[in-house]
């Protein structure tokens, strides 16, 4: 199939040069342009490459969050943006790069085929295709299936302790000195260098790599069934998307933690970020916009998510991949071939793209707005309320707000609209409680559910969530389908809260402590 | 009476992987090489889209074509150059032209 393309190549160049409507590259002002980045900014092929590569390094250089020698996990989905990201890292690592990137990359691919009803064979085919692409990068890679969320530990929902790092410049100096010393001793083994730096790339982690790869081949059927059940229990596509996003982030976090990666690179483009900015506002996640769309997301404490592709539009990425033959793998997802109004996320994407077609500065305007957003004061004093984080997304809870807030208004309206229902059920409820204490149930199984521990737990489970995650959970038919680690952690937390209440009287207040 | 040939790739095309989303609407075929019927006026992209819609699209044409142009979010490359530089819908096709459609939409 590609041969034809090659055969046409010489002719193609002639025709493009003849027909670019006289447009030349705005940078070198010599070659004819192949791509219009913004209105009036036409680039030729070589200037575009330079611009693209420079932007990646500039984004990383400007933000200074990746320390030399640090292990960085590249989250690869197979799509164009993450493929371009992996390629950029490869480019930066290559010998002829003017300033080599100094971190140690690894790649993670999560197979989510189950969520959109793919057969085992189709998934195998996708995975082998991904494997082919990843093998060519030469980086260590992990292929993991989403089913693994069912074997995650509850600790994944606890915030890690951020590693104390010295000043960036000092770290870089130290790294340089170490590298020089290494050069003198003639030892060029990068692994040893890392071991000196205290980064864990031991053989054991290599073994755990193998373990991940082998388990991903055949996820247990029970887990696949559970996953199907979980996604079937979500009533809307919007909730399915959010659920998938949550589970995926937990799995990425887990792999990053177990394999010793302290940074994760996620390949969201600025087009995608503007879409998620709008959809997150609509989903009630406005309080976390700086975390969800910013360059560096440090909500997990020990593992930071960074988004180095956020300066590129999808158009630039698509052109780069096409012009410089970056392989990507197409894998159908939840939103393949769905109606435009099937989910909030889809609708926001259509909205942004339509506006962008008529007003080419839409994406950049929305994106620049997101850049100006800052973490709210809730997160600023995170030291004091570190424990109060959403059970699912681990963002600082946005539900502790004053009486005169939109949140309380919705709570009250929700309560009132339930009141009618409650009245209807009231006798059953009160009698249910009393009879349960006696150890027997006086009502049928339908009413009996009321005094089941799970039903009693439901309100406290919801209390542990942020507003956005509450809406997602509301769209789930039952909480039982959620993976065990979520339920365990919820139980763990509620027990802690209870315990805290019990011993509250004996605890010294911080202010009191200071007085003594 | 000129016979027009062009290769018709769908998706992010690379030497190895020839998939990228939009092909799902075309019966899973990524690359089409078609001969357009002769007509008195030269073919332009606008007419080509109508022709594709009638002859190649297997399902859900609105996911690919909306109005008389492509759905917002689908990029068009004419001989590996941005169609915005080539006059978009008014570009007149020539023999052996190579048109690529790339979907930047999530989910293909």
From Swiss-Prot, chain A:
The family this protein is said to belong to: Belongs to the CTU2/NCS2 family.
Record-linked HAMAP family: CTU2
Keywords for this protein: Cytoplasm, tRNA processing
Biological pathway: tRNA modification; 5-methoxycarbonylmethyl-2-thiouridine-tRNA biosynthesis
SUPFAM superfamilies: Adenine nucleotide alpha hydrolases-like
MF terms (GO), sorted A to Z: nucleotidyltransferase activity; tRNA binding
Principal cellular location given in the protein's record: cytoplasm
InterPro entries noted in UniProt: CTU2, Rossmann-like_a/b/a_fold
GO biological process, alphabetically ordered: protein urmylation; tRNA thio-modification; tRNA wobble uridine modification
Domain of life, per lineage: Eukaryota
Gene3D superfamilies the record matches: HUPs
Compartments where found: Cytoplasm
Lineage: Eukaryota, Metazoa, Chordata, Craniata, Vertebrata
Name of the protein in its database record: Cytoplasmic tRNA 2-thiolation protein 2
């Amino acid at each position: 199939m590609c041969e034809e393309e090659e055969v046409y190549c010489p002719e193609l160049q002639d025709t493009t040069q003849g027909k670019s409507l006289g447009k030349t590259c705005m940078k070198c002002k010599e070659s004819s342009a192949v791509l219009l980045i913004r209105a009036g900014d036409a680039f030729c092929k070589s200037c575009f490459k330079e611009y693209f590569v420079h932007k990646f390094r500039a984004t990383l250089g400007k933000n200074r969050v990746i320390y030399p020698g640090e292990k960085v996990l590249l989250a690869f989905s197979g799509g164009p943006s993450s493929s371009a990201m992996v390629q950029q890292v490869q480019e930066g690592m290559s010998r002829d790069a003017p300033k080599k990137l100094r971190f140690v990359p690894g790649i993670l691919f999560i197979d989510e085929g189950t969520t959109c009803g793919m057969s085992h064979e189709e998934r195998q085919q996708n995975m082998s295709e991904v494997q082919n692409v990843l093998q060519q990068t030469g980086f260590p890679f992990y292929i993991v299936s989403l089913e693994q969320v069912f074997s995650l530990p509850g600790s994944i929902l606890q915030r890690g302790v951020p590693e104390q790092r010295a000043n960036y410049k000092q770290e870089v100096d130290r790294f340089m000195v170490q590298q020089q010393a290494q050069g003198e001793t003639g030892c060029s083994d990068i692994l040893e260098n890392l071991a000196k730096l205290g980064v864990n790339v031991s053989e054991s982690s290599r073994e755990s790599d193998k373990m991940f790869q082998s388990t991903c081949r055949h996820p247990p059927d029970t887990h696949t069934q559970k996953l199907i059940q979980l996604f079937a229990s979500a009533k809307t596509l919007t909730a399915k998307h959010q659920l998938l996003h949550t589970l995926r982030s937990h799995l990425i976090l887990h792999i990053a933690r177990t394999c010793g990666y302290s940074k994760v690179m996620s390949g969201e483009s600025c087009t995608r970020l503007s879409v998620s900015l709008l959809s997150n506002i609509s989903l009630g996640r406005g309080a976390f916009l700086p975390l969800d769309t910013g360059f560096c997301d440090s909500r997990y404490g020990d593992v930071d998510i960074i988004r180095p592709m956020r300066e590129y539009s999808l158009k630039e990425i698509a052109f780069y991949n096409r012009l410089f033959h970056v392989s990507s793998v197409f894998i159908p997802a939840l939103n393949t071939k769905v109606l435009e109004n099937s989910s909030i996320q889809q609708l926001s994407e259509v909205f942004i793209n339509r506006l962008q077609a008529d007003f080419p500065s839409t994406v950049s305007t929305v994106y620049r707005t997101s850049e100006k957003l800052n973490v709210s004061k809730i997160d600023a004093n995170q030291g004091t309320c570190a424990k109060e984080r959403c059970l699912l997304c681990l963002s600082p809870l946005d539900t502790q707000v004053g009486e005169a807030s939109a949140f309380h208004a919705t709570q009250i309206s929700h309560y009132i609209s339930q009141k009618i229902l409650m009245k209807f059920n009231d006798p059953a409820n009160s009698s249910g409680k009393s009879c349960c204490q006696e150890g027997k149930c006086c009502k049928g199984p339908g009413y009996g559910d009321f005094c089941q521990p799970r039903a009693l737990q439901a309100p406290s489970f919801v209390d542990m969530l942020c507003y956005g995650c509450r809406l997602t959970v509301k769209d789930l038919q039952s909480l039982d389908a959620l993976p065990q680690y979520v339920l365990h952690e919820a139980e763990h937390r509620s027990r802690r809260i209870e315990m805290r209440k019990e011993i509250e009287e004996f605890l010294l207040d911080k202010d009191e402590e200071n007085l003594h | 009476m000129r016979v027009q040939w062009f290769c018709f790739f769908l998706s992010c095309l690379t030497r190895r992987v020839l998939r990228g989303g939009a092909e799902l609407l075309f019966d899973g075929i990524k690359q089409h090489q078609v001969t357009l019927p002769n007509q008195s006026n030269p073919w332009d992209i606008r007419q080509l889209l109508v022709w594709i819609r009638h002859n190649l699209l297997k399902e859900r044409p609105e996911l690919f074509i909306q109005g008389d142009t492509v759905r917002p979010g689908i990029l068009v490359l004419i001989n590996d150059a941005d169609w915005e530089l080539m006059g978009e819908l008014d570009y007149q096709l020539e023999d052996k032209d190579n048109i690529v459609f790339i979907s930047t939409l999530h989910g293909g």
